Amino acid sequence: YTVSEINVDTRYETPKAKNVKLTDGDVDLTVNVKFNNELKTGSIKINKQSEDNQNGGREFTVTGNGKTYSIKTGSDGVAILSDIPVYDSNNQKIVYTISEKNVPVKYVVPASQTVTLTADATTTKTFKNVLKKFTAQVTKQDSETASAQGDGTLSGAVYGIYRNGELVDTYTTDENGYFKTKEYVCGNYTVQEISPSEGYLLDETVYPVGAETENYSIEH
């Protein structure tokens, strides 16, 4: 005889059928056949990416169906959570929430992501860390009148952006004495005039600019 379990709940793997052999001498014999229902499971793979390629040792939590799992990426930026249930006790797919924890302050905290699983398969989610950045806006003015005097002009002055004493970029003022920098990763920088506009002496003042990462939660 072949004994098979039928109408197996969705959350379980269907167990293999079992064969039972009875002989003429087995009168009034009860044969016990044991079936073990195993939950359907799947896996979650997290790919960690960041603008500065520092992806190892990042911490994540995966929560769902009243349970929380903690995992950490390897040096390759990959973390895998294996063999977790696909369905809950009501045979409904479990919605798992993946969150990155203890994100270094230099990054914007990425949004949590949700996922449902497929039995005997790996579902992949990618988390990207964006570095916090800032821009600086500089306006050159006449020290007495703010506007240019006589034959002087506020346009054409060249300024340098420095970090740790090294020149990063140069910018030139427009007709209003203005320029705006591109985005820079948050940190401490300085602005200094390299060559003045026509009619003016060089301003040798070193102006600090920058942004402290702990004061911001967004990219810009």
Show where each model-derived region lies:
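Solvent-exposed loop/turn and edge beta-strand elements of beta-rich ligand-binding domains
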Residues: Y1-H220
